[in-house]
Amino acid sequence: DGVIRMDGVLYVLEIKASTQQSTLINLGEKFPEPFVLEQWNEEYYAQAMTYCKFAEIENHLLICSDAGGRKLHIVRTPYNATYADALMLKAERIADAKEPPNKVGGRNFWKCKLCSFYGICYEP
């Protein structure tokens, strides 16, 4: 990951390997390229827009390989300042809140089990 200039355009560069690469490719056939990343994985899209915001770069370039690293697919996404600013406001609200936000899962939800705050939410 880093910053790259391609065809005179500056991009925040991310390189990912995913078992879901075929879904990404299929979405590229259904949606215009600027919308593909958000449709494919909203968490990756949020990450990309945050990187662009803090790097002050107007474009994001994802190079995604299949799990074996043999096939590559490229997706270019323009920076969405409105979306990135909304994420920052959400983070500020959570950080400044007197009470923690509602739990997104439960004690046995896999995302919760992987979270570094699991003990705060579920341990006595």
What positions do the PLM features span?
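Conserved catalytic cores of phosphodiester-cleaving nucleases, focusing on short active-site segments
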Residues: 1-35, 51
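Metal-dependent nuclease catalytic regions and adjoining charged, substrate-binding loops involved
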Residues: 25-27, 35-45, 50-124
